[in-house]
């Protein structure tokens, strides 16, 4: 607690008292309830933590860390968005939702024109991280989605294990479709991933999409993939490369905190960016820490 207080004091000293408060928005956090008869997970799926990560657990963490808002990304345990939307309904100034959709069913296209009429819904998050879902990118299963989402004016966050280059064609063909790369293009935000993934190559692939103005990127893979303690210096070179390619208005601070609790406190996840990355100016931090994702998702 003493260290956290010292960090908070350090952050306050960075900005003049006359400056407006920086809005801090975490662009990715998973919420889920306990497994029960009315909240059943799909077979073969499991949560990132043994216990639920709930609204009531998140709010005090946010307050302690100085996080103003969170983009809830429902976990890939099923295609349900109801608990995330409940959070947004109860706390509309704190939570918004990037909802999941049954991508394998073309009939889901009928949901998109009114998708954002659901209170708190900001867009869609799609995942291609298993052999069956990865196949959707090449066998035509997902083809219906990109023009439908573009027509509906929806922002789309995507996780595509090893297949980020495929999105160059999607970004070019659908220039009005807002695309947001998860985890800096890395396979996950877990340090176990470091054993198998060529991180420099994955970063190269993500940077290659920076030429498309409709593409932006989340930093959610940074801390979880670090093999060092705070302030995670081994990831700084990758953060700077991504930032230099995309610029402050297309880079989004995100924690995926439930995937990396053991790595750092929530407050450290904030100060990592606000205090430890010398290549970021104060204006850059304003964009990266919240202003950019609010603009990208049109979240007022």
PLM-predicted stretches and their roles:
Residues 28, 62, 84, 149, ...:
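Conserved, mostly hydrophobic/aromatic
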Residues 25-27, 72-73, 98, 125, ...:
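Active-site neighborhood of phospho(di)ester-bond hydrolases with catalytic His/Asp-centered motifs
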Residues 33-56, 61-65, 118-127, 177-178, ...:
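Active-site gating loops and adjacent loop-to-helix segments of metal-dependent hydrolytic enzymes
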Residues 1-12, 22-27, 43, 47-69, ...:
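Mid-to-C-terminal alpha-helical segments outside catalytic/metal-binding sites
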Residues 68-69, 78-162, 169, 218-222:
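Active-site gating/metal-coordination segments in enzymes
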